A protein has these predicted regions:
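C-terminal motif of bacterial Sec signal peptides marking the signal peptidase cleavage site
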Residues: 13-16
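Short, well-structured beta-strand
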Residues: 23-26, 120, 125-197
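Secretory pathway targeting signatures of secreted, lumenal, and periplasmic proteins
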Residues: 46-106
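Short secondary-structure junctions
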Residues: 57-68, 113-127
Length: 197
């Protein structure tokens, strides 16, 4: 009897240790994004000597978080899109001479260069809309960077506008790619429709 009980116990232990299920990795999924309808409206502000078309799903927020040296600039603002958890920071600075322009261009490059640590690739696209006196560069930065698109626009004599697209979350380039592509069209539209006053 003892041998029978011991045999049954040993067989039970061996049978209970086998796992017939095969472990499978979980499929990679990303949250579903509900895109707003692409529709644009004219943007113009008394503080800003330019106008452009901006998406209707962006909210204008005046930037009041400036240092003492920056308070003179009244045309700094964010275009916020809560639905896509992103914003475009815009800063306009009037320029009086070539030295001011060179300094602003240098600042724009320094802001872009701060992303080089995490960037895997950077593309610079020249903007030249001579009939509207709009010149500048668009920087497209690939990799887990805070701002994958930055740009600056100028008429090279009195206006300088800088913009940066930010995602308000940890950036996994694969997961934000569809949202990034969606917003790239908006940034392009803003640049194409810019008019100096």
């Amino acid at each position: 009897m003892r041998i029978l009980t011991l045999t049954i116990l040993v067989i039970s232990i061996f049978l209970s240790c086998t796992d017939m299920s095969i472990p499978l990795p979980k499929p990679r999924v990303y949250p579903k994004v509900v895109y707003p309808v692409k529709d644009y409206q004219s943007f113009s502000s008394n503080n800003c000597p330019f106008s452009m078309m901006i998406p209707k799903y962006f909210i204008f927020n005046q930037d009041n978080n400036k240092t003492e040296n920056e308070k003179q600039y009244t045309c700094w603002f964010d275009l916020v899109c809560n639905k896509l958890n992103t914003n475009i920071h815009m800063s306009y600075v009037p320029i009086d001479n070539r030295a001011d322009l060179d300094e602003m261009i240098q600042d724009a490059f320094e802001m872009v260069n701060k992303h080089n640590v995490k960037a895997s690739y950077r593309d610079e696209i020249k903007i030249n809309i001579a009939e509207k006196k709009i010149y500048g560069l668009v920087f497209k930065i690939d990799g887990p960077v805070a701002s994958p698109t930055q740009f600056f626009l100028t008429d090279s004599t009195s206006h300088f506008l800088r913009g940066s697209l930010y995602f308000n979350d940890v950036v996994n380039r694969d997961s934000i790619a569809p949202v990034y592509d969606f917003l790239e069209l908006d940034v392009s539209k803003m640049i194409e429709t810019l008019e100096w006053k």
